[in-house]
């Protein structure tokens, strides 16, 4: 399928080509690769429980230029980072590579080889304006970009669907990158646009897209990097699905989507004694938030933005009170402080919520357009220049195109 890149993407691809030729020399032919960042619009920690999510690809992306090198290795040079090589004759995961881009390349190579692709050497020059560690899924974007590059450059395999690419990327994130995650991040990156996702069947997640930009309804989608990489709280993040799934296991199930809330309510006292209160609170959040996702999707379909805003605030409160992925132990509370300060500017208008995994990363704010300049300036004063940015939904998912 032919892809048309917008002016912003084309400019970033041109930078990637310059970097390619600086690092590797000129090539006979170039492959352009694009993978957007993403924003979780609704559904905080619902995906790993087989629940529902609304997510949107954003107008920030990882863009890369690739070409075969006939050297038997994959060479990657990202602007601002040290270059590295991956020997694709060794595709085993290793803890020494956890949380590294090298692990992502190795993991995606392993997944494509399993599909029947024949690996070969290539060079990849990367430019990104997706903030790393800020909750916009920079790792998922890199996974999807690497996967689309290998799909186009390697022989022997068949076309990879967006869902399959997302599942391969999730495997890479979990097994090679060493970070637990649901499927939402990767599927949003691979699909593009604004999409409702149903993860009840993990083998065949369902997705429905909607052509919508929040600016058309009077709101700016803003994300605030709170200045704390959520990688620092990987253990806290990992505890969320573990505790939710302990509740499910008490009913002989693997995920909360398989447990009727009425069955849970009938056994609260017993479950408190066996699992502790926090696991129950997180389960309560799942059912409440999943219902809010469905209601917010209906609101967006019906252009009822004010109801969407009201329910988004309810979602944010649930994350803080029940899911408990905003505050961390001790006096260092960057995400909660960001939410409180954002509320102090909005004064009851718009909506604020924790964004993505939580425990740092970023917060999400729907800001009335009349306030957006003031809001961004004030949040940047508190959290640093560039911490608060106004984003738009991008319809382009992860793709590759020969130039």
Question: What are the residue ranges of the model-derived segments?
Answer:
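Glycine-rich phosphate-binding loop
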Residues: 359
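Gly/Ser-rich oxyanion-binding loop with an adjacent helix/lid
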Residues: 1-31, 36-52, 88-92, 97-216, ...
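Structural signature of FAD isoalloxazine-binding scaffolds in flavoprotein oxidoreductases
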Residues: 52-70, 191
